[in-house]
A protein has these predicted regions:
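Conserved N-terminal phosphate-binding loop of PLP-dependent enzymes in the Aspartate aminotransferase
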Residues: 1-229
């Protein structure tokens, strides 16, 4: 299926079929990236994440958003979930929460989930902490970084620069037959797929992407090669 809206509905139906086959009571949670990063920037249709949230709510399944890449402005919104109009039950974050100034990650939990543990008394205790949990330096770095991210209005700039980058990548596709697809357009998330032949979508050797990465780096542009992307 090449129509993204129809594909979204087909996947949602397949997901519900699988849920009913396995039994909703056997599924604790569903995890997804709002925009798939490492796979070469795979952007779902705008109906997919809201549809999955409705599906999870219908069957009593928690939704966990992996916002390690998409969080804190990258998509042109404060989170990738918010970009699609979704409030997940959990949001796992890292990277932009401290922008690499200090190693730090955080799992954000919706109030209705937290209340389950808080009201359970001693039975609600989950002993999953470890030595470095809630490190004060990491927490301070995260707060300072997020304040600066907000002050600079990073999300608005990411949206504008992202549009500029996406349109530029599409113009490159018009000039170079080795570019088989350009994906993205949601903030600073754009992927370029390299192919030997556009008609057959025969993939370029992964070494080609690494060569492009090196040339880009030599010219002051940071990008990441991922397979044929």
């Amino acid at each position: 299926e090449t129509d993204s809206a129809k594909l979204s509905q087909l996947i949602l139906q397949a997901a519900e079929d699988e849920i009913m086959f396995e039994g909703p009571n056997t599924i604790a949670a569903f995890i997804m990236e709002p925009v798939l990063g490492a796979g070469g920037i795979m952007v779902p249709h705008e109906t997919f994440m809201p549809g999955m949230q409705q599906l999870c709510s219908k069957h009593g399944i928690l939704m966990i958003a992996d916002e390690v890449i998409t969080g804190f402005g990258r998509t042109g919104d404060w989170s990738g979930s918010r970009h699609w109009g979704v409030q997940p039950d959990f949001m796992c974050t890292a990277k932009a929460i401290t922008n690499g100034y200090y190693p730090f990650g955080a799992c954000m939990i919706a109030e209705h989930v937290a209340e389950v543990f808080e009201r359970a008394g001693a039975d609600g205790f989950v002993g999953h902490g470890y030595t470095y949990t809630a490190h004060p330096v990491g927490a301070a770095a995260a707060i300072a970084c997020l304040k600066e991210t907000e002050r600079l209005d990073v999300k608005t700039n990411a949206a504008a620069r992202g549009t500029q980058m996406f349109e530029g990548a599409k113009r490159l596709m018009e000039k170079h037959s080795a570019i088989g697809d350009v994906r993205g357009g949601h903030g600073l998330m754009t992927g370029i797929e390299f192919v030997k032949d556009r008609a057959t979508k025969a993939p370029m050797d992964p070494s080609f992407g690494l060569s492009v990465q090196k040339v880009a780096m030599d010219n002051g542009v940071m990008l990441r090669a991922s397979g044929t992307n």
